[in-house]
Amino acid sequence: MSYKRSSLMQERMEQNRKSILSSARKIISEGGFKDAQIQTIAEQAGVSSGLVYRYFDNKSQVLIEVLSDAINTELLVIESITESDLSAKQKLHKAVATFVKRALNSPQLAYSLMFEPVDSTVEHERFRVKQLIKKSIKKILADGNASGEFILDDLNTAALCVVGAMTYVVVEPLDPAQNTKFDHAHKDYFSKQIADFCVDAVQKK
């Protein structure tokens, strides 16, 4: 009986945690980090503020976890492209275009996760996840060097440039102040332009 109660308690605790993070993500996707206050998150999750603090020391910890979960999803997408049978050039084009288009499909969430002003702890997490994206892009570039599709002396710098292009290029279209609306066709066009640019920058001439 004690084991059963312990198991049920653990399950309930995990569910509470998931509910808190899911609520925080929903709030961020609708209004940004500025709207993701502990009280608001608790109300959205249907729990007390005190319960939120049982799982997280402060708001920044909640935001960092939401950021980590979101970027892990993007990394899985990029890594699946990296491990595919496509050529290095095709992998790079698809990885960049997919990342940009997914950002445009969730504009407020993407803007908040990448650009909205935050405290230093969340900014540090942003830096960490960009390093992970760079690692995947660097692998594609290395494959391209090996196949002769690319000729790059400094893979790390080239990967940084690609990550910079695929992330910062969406600052303007994602900025909530711009209130920009993109239809499906324009998202395809915009993401293709960025992917074309990145491939052209590194491919063998």
Model-inferred region functions:
Residues S19, I27-Q61, E65:
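Helix-turn-helix
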Residues E65, E79-N105, A158-V162, D188-S191:
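Hydrophobic alpha-helical connector segments
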Residues N72-E79, N105, T121-S147, N156-L160, ...:
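Amphipathic alpha-helical packing segments from all-alpha helical-bundle domains
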Residues M13-A24, I41, V66-A70, E74, ...:
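Generic hydrophobic, amphipathic alpha-helix propensity
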Residues Y111, F115, N145-D196, K205:
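Hydrophobic/aromatic-rich alpha-helical bundle segments in the mid-to-C-terminal region
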Residues M1-Q15:
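N-terminal intrinsically disordered/low-complexity leader segments
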Residues F56, M114-S120:
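Short helix-capping/turn signature of helix-turn-helix
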Residues L21, H93, A97, K134, ...:
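An amphipathic alpha-helix signature
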